[in-house]
Amino acid sequence: MVPRLLLRAWPRGPAVGPGAPSRPLSAGSGPGQYLQRSIVPTMHYQDSLPRLPIPKLEDTIRRYLSAQKPLLDDGQFRKTEQFCKNFENGIGKELHEQLVAQDKQNKHTSYISGPWFDMYLSARDSVVLNFNPFMAFNPDPKSEYNDQLTRATNMTVSAIRFLKTLRDGLLEPEVFHLNPAKSDTDTFKRLIRFVPSSLSWYGAYLVNAYPLDMSQYFRLFNSTRLPKPSRDELFTDDKARHLLVLRKGNFYIFDVLDQDGNIVSPSEIQAHLKYILSDSSPAPEFPLAYLTSENRDIWAELRQKLMSSGNEESLRKVDSAVFCLCLDDFPIKDLVHLSHNMLHGDGTNRWFDKSFNLIIAKDGSAAVHFEHSWGDGVAVLRFFNEVFKDSTQIPAITPQSQPATADSTVTVQKLNFKLTDALKTGITAAKEKFDATMKTLTIDCLQFQRGGKEFLKKQKLSPDAVAQLAFQMAFLRQYGQTVATYESCSTAAFKHGRTETIRPASIYTKRCSEAFVREPSRHSAGELQQMMAECSKYHGQLTKEAAMGQGFDRHLFALRHLAAAKGIILPELYLDPAYGQINHNVLSTSTLSSPAVNLGGFAPVVSDGFGVGYAVHGNWIGCNVSSYPGRNAREFLQCVEKALEDMFDALEGKSIKS
C-alpha cells in the first residue's frame, strides 16, 4: 500500500499558504521568525495515526526462514526450521499472546518504542562510530555564501527559525503524498484543517496521503543523552534559549532567543560568532569533549566527578543548549576527509551526546552529526532539508553584511571547567582510546556515472533493488559468500513507529549474484535481465512489507525483550547460531537522497563488516563505505563498480566481461 517511507521527498515548496494560522503564536511572531506558516497545524494528524501492527507469529516465522535460506546450508537450515516450529507452537505462542495483550493496554504508543529506547540507552559502547551517523550538506550554490562565518550565521538562524516554526505549530505536517496533485494542495489543506485531529488521518488517507509520526521532533532541540550507570537518560529543557558553540575544544554560549521568544537579530548572531572565531584562546590541555566518546559506564562515573567538582551549572548549560554548533579551524580536502571529519573528527570539538551537532568547517563544508537513541533520522532529515532550503534561498545575512555592534565580551560566555587529577586522567585515557579506534577506520566512496534512477525505472527495475543487488554481487566476488545484510526502513507511517529491517540478501539475489560473478558466459543477457527483474520484484515486496510494519526483525526482537523482562529462559530459537549470524550484520546499509544531501555515512556495526551509505540519483549512483581492518572498503567499492557495470551491460544487451 505505501512505498518505502524513507522520506525521500523534498519538503513542499514555500508553505506560506493563504490565510493566517488559526492558533495563538508566541510573542516573537514577527517577520523572519518562521520558515513557513502552515495552515494545517504541525501535530494535526498525530492523534489519529494508525498503530504499528504486530505481525502474526506464523508470518514472522515464515519471513525469518526465507531470510535465513540464502545464509545456511541444508543441514543448518533444517535445524533452524525445527527451532522455529518448536517456538511457534510453544513458548513463542505464549510470548506473542502476552505481547499482543500488553500492546492493547498501551494504545498511546507502539509495541517497539519502549524496547527500542531500552536497546539504545542500555548499550554501553561508545556512541561514536557504534551509533551516531552524519549527513553532509551540499555547498551553498552561491559560492561566496560558503564563507564560514556567513554560512554558520545563516544556518544557525534557519535552525532557530525551524525551532520556532515547529513549536508554534506552523511547520507543515510531515506527509507522504502518493498523489501530490490531489493531496498536496491548498484546497485540501484548507479542508483538512477543519477535520478534528482524532479523524484527520482518515481524511488524508482518502486522498492517498499518509501523514507520518512526528513524536520524535520534540527531542531535536535542547536535548542531550546523559550517561548513567547501566542505562542512559534523555534530557530535554525547552525553556533554555542559548546556543552552545565549540571551537578548538573551547565551549561558548550565548542566547539566540530573547525573553519574548524572538530570534536574536541575525547581525547580532553574526557578531557573536565572529567574536568566537577570532578568539585567540589556545585549545585546552585536557579537552572535555573526549569524555562523550567513552564507554557509557566510564563516562557516567566521570560525569559524577565533574558534577561534584563544581561543574554542575556549566554542564547544565551544555545539556540544555538549543543545539551544538561546531566551528572547525581547517578546510575539507575531499569527500573522504569530509566523512571522517563529520563522523568522528579529532574528538575535541564535538559534544557527541547532544541530540545533534551542526558542524561547519573553515571552507563552509557543513554537516549534521546526530545521536541515535532519540530518533531515527526522520526528524533530522526534515530539519536538514528545511535548513538547507531556508539558508540558501532566504539567507539571513549576505557575505557583505556587517555584524551588529554588540558587546560580545559581555553576551558570549566562555564555559570553564574545574578538572581534578582523576578527571584529567580520565580525559587522557579517553583520548588515547579515541585516537586508537579512529586509526582503525577506513572510509572510501564511489560515484558511478553511467546512469541511475531514470535509466533503471525505464527498465522497470527498482533503483534500490539494483543498488542492493550490487552489494550482494560485490561481497560474493570479494569474499565468496552471502552474508547477513541489513537495510533500514522507516515505519513512521504509524504512531511511535521507529524502523523495520529489509533483508536484501535472498535466494533470488544469491542466484542472480552467482550467475553474474561465477558464470556470466553461461547466461544470455535476457536471462540475466530476467533474474534481475525477479530480484527487483522480491525486494519491492520486502520493502512494502517492512514499511507496513510487516517485517520479522522487530517482532522477534520484542518477543526476546519480553522474555528477558519476564525472567523467562531464552527460547532456543534465540540460542541458535543461525539467529546470532543473521543479526551479525556484515553489510549494514542505509539510503537517503535529497537535494540538500552531499553524502551521509556511518561506521560498520560489526568489526568484520561494512557500513554502506548510498543514494541512487537521477543519473548516477553514490556510495560511501566504511570498514575496519578485517575488511577492505576500497576493494569492496571496486567490486560494487564492477557489479553495476555488469548489470548495466546486461540491461543494454551486451555480454558480461569476466
Curated annotation (Swiss-Prot):
Intramembrane segments of this protein: 179-208
EC number: 2.3.1.21
Membrane topology, record value: Peripheral membrane protein
PROSITE patterns linked: ACYLTRANSF_C_1, ACYLTRANSF_C_2
Catalysed conversion reaction: (R)-carnitine + hexadecanoyl-CoA = O-hexadecanoyl-(R)-carnitine + CoA; octanoyl-CoA + (R)-carnitine = O-octanoyl-(R)-carnitine + CoA; decanoyl-CoA + (R)-carnitine = O-decanoyl-(R)-carnitine + CoA; dodecanoyl-CoA + (R)-carnitine = O-dodecanoyl-R-carnitine + CoA
Gene Ontology molecular functions: acyltransferase activity; carnitine O-octanoyltransferase activity; carnitine O-palmitoyltransferase activity
Subcellular location: Mitochondrion inner membrane
Targeting presequence: 1-25
Mitochondrial matrix side, ranges: 26-178, 209-658
Residue positions of the active site: 372 (proton acceptor)
Pathway: Lipid metabolism; fatty acid beta-oxidation
Keyword set, alphabetical order: Acetylation, Acyltransferase, Fatty acid metabolism, Lipid metabolism, Membrane, Mitochondrion, Mitochondrion inner membrane, Transferase, Transit peptide, Transport
Any Pfam family the entry gives: Carn_acyltransf
N6-acetyllysine, modified sites: 79, 239, 305, 418, 510, 544
Positions with a binding annotation for (R)-carnitine: 486, 488, 499
Alphabetical list of InterPro entries matching this protein: Carn_acyl_trans, Carn_acyl_trans_N, CAT-like_dom_sf, Cho/carn_acyl_trans, Cho/carn_acyl_trans_2
GO biological process annotation, one example: carnitine metabolic process
Annotated CoA binding sites: 452-464
Function: Involved in the intramitochondrial synthesis of acylcarnitines from accumulated acyl-CoA metabolites. Reconverts acylcarnitines back into the respective acyl-CoA esters that can then undergo beta-oxidation, an essential step for the mitochondrial uptake of long-chain fatty acids and their subsequent beta-oxidation in the mitochondrion. Active with medium (C8-C12) and long-chain (C14-C18) acyl-CoA esters.
Record family assignment: Belongs to the carnitine/choline acetyltransferase family.
Protein name (database record): Carnitine O-palmitoyltransferase 2, mitochondrial
Source species of the chain: Macaca fascicularis (Crab-eating macaque)
Gene that encodes the chain: CPT2
